[in-house]
Amino acid sequence: MKTYNIFSIDEFKTNIENNSRLLGIDPGKRNIGLAICDENKKVSTPLKVLQKNKFEVLIKEINQIIKENHIKGIVIGNPINMDGTSGKSSQSASDFAKNLSKNITIPITMWDERLSSEGSFKMTKQLDTNVSNRVNKLDKNAAAFILQGAIDYLSN
């Protein structure tokens, strides 16, 4: 049976290198938002939005980003329901993480992203008044919001 490199957030902390960058992923239905953090794991920055294509294409794009940015760990948003239960979206994110872990060897963790889309929307709306620009930035801003939550936790 395949052993996945998916860890709890506390296990993740012990499996990532100090002074390394992380990749935040917000796996949506149509798009996948990406964000990265600095080597000190203090600030997350929106990176880009990938179209949800064939999984092989996504893996190739994500591997390229990992290589170019010297990424040493991945934080994937887990859309847990407000009551703490896992729904369809959470199961989809878990499946995405498992499939990703079969193709990528760096540590992966899932991070509770409750309210990240709402927070991302408010942040994007404040920063950009152009509606079409907001739509394009929402997914990568959500990934940055998710990653920031995780790195804030990791720094404590």
How does the language model describe each region?
Residues 2-23, 30, 35-156:
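Phosphate- and other anionic-substrate recognition elements at nucleic-acid/protein interfaces
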